[in-house]
């Protein structure tokens, strides 16, 4: 006997729709890197075309760096030193500091522009860090000689994974080789390098400070990173010249944007 139709079950399945007539074609990127100017255009397009504001991109960027830092740190007892600038790179750094602190890490933020009156998103992210009670100190007070070294470093590694992790969020794509790092920042990057030599692991946000995002040329006191977390696509300067030497392992994160975002958003760019 034929079973009566169930009036509550749709005639066409909404759980298993019919396959599309056209076969699926995987999206492929055309662009392999971004210049400084293309990165700025991409940030603008994300807001105007996809309605994804810079705050969301910044949050995703900070989360990406946080995930790398957790792998490098090895344990929550590993000290994390976050160097923050005054631009969007610094905003990413403040997000990262907040997320790491919320996950139980001991975080110190080193302000590379003490006394500067922050505005916009960077101010917002910085205030969130202050509200949590995270220590913010002038970067000139960072003392790399106090980091673990020698036998003591070996002991620390057994207990906490690494002696410490340094996050470089001082300057991003805005640095141009034609304008050398000011002496104030050179002093800070020199301290970071001393810490690196003493066993600290260094993560650069988007591009190491002192590396030109377009040419790969680098300041004499540019930061040397073990890993660089770059966003959307690698910056052109990471793939050539000294930029390739200083960037370490390059990790690319889409920060919440479609995989072909750069191609579609910048299709009118030269």
Language-model-derived ranges and their functions:
Residues 2-81:
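An N-terminal, well-structured beta->alpha segment
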Residues 2-34, 163-270:
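YjeF_N-associated NAD(P)HX repair module
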Residues 30, 34-37, 52-64, 88-91, ...:
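Conserved active-site and cofactor/substrate-binding residues in soluble primary-metabolism enzymes
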Residues 39, 100, 109, 229, ...:
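Generic structural hydrophobic/aromatic packing signal, biased to beta-strands
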Residues 60, 67, 86, 249-250, ...:
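Short, surface-exposed, charged/polar-biased interaction segments
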Residues 63, 74, 97-99, 218, ...:
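Generic secondary-structure boundary signal with a strong preference for alpha-helix termini
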Residues 66-172, 180-205:
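Nucleotide and nucleotide-moiety/phosphate-recognizing core
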């Amino acid at each position: 006997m034929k079973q009566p139709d169930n009036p509550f079950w749709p005639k066409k399945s909404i759980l298993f729709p019919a396959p599309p007539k056209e076969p699926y074609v995987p999206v492929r990127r055309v662009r392999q890197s971004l210049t400084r100017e293309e990165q700025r255009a991409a940030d603008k397009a994300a807001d105007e075309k996809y309605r994804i504001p810079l705050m969301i991109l910044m949050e995703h960027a900070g989360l990406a760096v946080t995930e790398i830092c957790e792998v490098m740190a090895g344990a929550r007892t590993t000290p994390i030193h976050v160097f923050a600038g005054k631009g969007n790179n610094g905003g990413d750094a403040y997000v990262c500091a907040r997320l790491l602190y919320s996950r139980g890490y001991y975080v110190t933020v080193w302000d590379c522009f003490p006394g500067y009156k922050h505005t916009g998103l960077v101010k917002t992210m910085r205030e969130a860090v202050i509200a949590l009670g995270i220590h913010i100190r002038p970067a000139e007070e960072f003392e790399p000689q106090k980091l673990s070294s020698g036998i003591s470093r070996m002991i620390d590694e057994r207990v906490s994974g690494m002696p410490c992790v340094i996050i470089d969020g001082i300057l991003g794509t805005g640095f141009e080789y034609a304008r050398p790092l000011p002496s104030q920042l050179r002093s800070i990057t020199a301290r970071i390098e001393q810490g690196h030599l003493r066993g600290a692991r260094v993560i650069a946000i988007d591009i190491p400070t002192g590396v030109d995002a377009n040419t790969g040329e680098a300041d004499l006191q540019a930061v040397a990173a073990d890993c660089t977390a770059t966003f959307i696509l690698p910056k052109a300067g990471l793939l050539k010249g000294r930029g390739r030497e200083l960037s370490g392992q390059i990790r690319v994160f889409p920060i919440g944007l479609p995989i072909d975002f750069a191609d579609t958003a910048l299709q009118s760019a030269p």
